[in-house]
UniProtKB/Swiss-Prot annotation:
It comes from Escherichia coli (strain K12). InterPro entries: Glc/Gal-6P_isomerase (IPR006148), GlcN6P_deaminase-like (IPR052960), Glucosamine6P_isomerase (IPR004547), Glucosamine6P_isomerase_CS (IPR018321), NagB/RpiA_transferase-like (IPR037171). The active site is at D66 (proton acceptor), D129, H131 (proton acceptor). This is Uncharacterized protein YieK. The gene is yieK. GO terms for cellular component: cytoplasm; cytosol.
Length: 240
C-alpha cells in the first residue's frame, strides 16, 4: 500500500487526477471503474481540463461499479447520471467508451470484464461507515462478486436522502454493485478520502482488522493499493 497525504482537498483532487491520467495515457485499451459522489468532484474538474478534446484518450473505457435505478423510470440510473454530470459530459467522453453496469446486466458483468481484459484501475471513495461501492456494513460478504441487494429498512432512508434528494417515490426495490471479490480482482485500486468526517473510517480501513463490519477493510489486502487523503482525513492514522 502507498499512502499520500495532501494539505487539503484541492491538492488531493489534483494529485488524484494526475494519478488517474497516468493510467489513461497508456497506448493500449485502458479499463477504469470510477466513483460518483462529492469527494471526486474536484478530481474530475482537474481531469476534464486535461483530457477534453484530446482524441488520444479514446482508448480509455469507463465503468460504473454500482447502480441504483430510479423507480418507475426507464433509462439510466443514479450512478451513471451522476457520472455524466461530474465527468462524462464536461470531458466529452464518447458514448461507446461508457460501459454501463445495470440492474439488467449485472449477472454477466464479471464475465464481461474478464473478456475485456479486466479493470486496470478502480477509483473508490470511502463512506464514513467504512463502505465502498454499494458494499455496506451488515450487508456485504467478502466472497461476493457483482451482486443485487434489496433496499429495505433503514436503507430506504439512506438511499432516498443520500442519492435521490429525499424523494421516496424514486427509491427502487434493489440496487446492484460490484462486490469485494470483483473489486479485489482489479489490477490497481485508488481510494480518495477528504475531511475530518472520514478520519475514523480511514483508520479502521487501513489500520484496523479485516472484517465485514468495515467492508472497505478488505482493500488493505490488495497488492496494489494507493490511498490519497487530505490531512483532515488522515488525522487519526498512526504514522511513523
Amino acid at each position: 500500500m502507498k499512502l499520500i497525504i495532501t494539505e487539503d482537498y484541492q491538492e488531493m483532487s489534483r494529485v488524484a487526477a494526475h494519478h488517474l491520467l497516468g493510467y489513461m495515457s497508456k497506448t493500449r485499451r485502458v479499463n477504469l471503474a470510477i466513483t460518483a459522489g462529492s469527494t471526486p468532484k474536484g478530481m474530475y474538474e482537474y481531469l476534464t481540463t486535461l483530457v477534453k478534446g484530446k482524441p488520444w484518450y479514446d482508448n480509455c473505457y469507463f465503468y460504473n461499479f454500482d447502480e441504483i435505478p430510479f423507480r418507475g423510470k426507464e433509462g439510466e440510473g443514479v450512478t451513471i447520471t451522476n457520472l455524466r454530470n461530474l465527468f462524462f459530459t464536461p470531458a466529452g467522453i464518447k458514448e461507446e467508451n461508457i460501459q454501463k453496469l445495470t440492474i439488467d446486466n449485472y449477472r454477466e458483468h464479471d464475465q464481461k470484464l474478464a473478456r475485456e481484459g479486466g479493470l486496470d484501475l478502480v477509483v473508490l471513495g470511502l463512506g464514513a461507515d467504512g463502505h465502498f461501492c454499494g458494499n455496506l456494513p451488515n450487508t456485504t460478504h467478502f466472497h461476493e462478486q457483482t451482486v443485487e441487494f434489496p433496499i429495505q429498512g433503514e436503507m430506504v432512508d439512506i438511499v432516498a436522502h443520500g442519492e435521490l434528494g429525499g424523494d421516496f417515490s424514486l427509491v427502487p426495490d434493489s440496487y446492484v454493485t460490484m462486490g469485494p471479490k470483483s473489486i479485489m480482482a482489479a489490477k490497481n485500486l485508488l481510494i480518495i478520502v477528504s475531511g475530518a468526517g472520514k478520519a475514523q473510517a480511514l483508520k479502521n480501513v487501513l489500520q484496523g482488522p479485516v472484517t465485514e463490519d468495515v467492508p472497505a477493510s478488505v482493500l488493505q489486502l490488495h497488492p496494489s493499493l494507493m490511498v490519497i487523503a487530505d490531512k483532515a482525513a488522515a488525522a487519526e492514522l498512526a504514522l511513523g
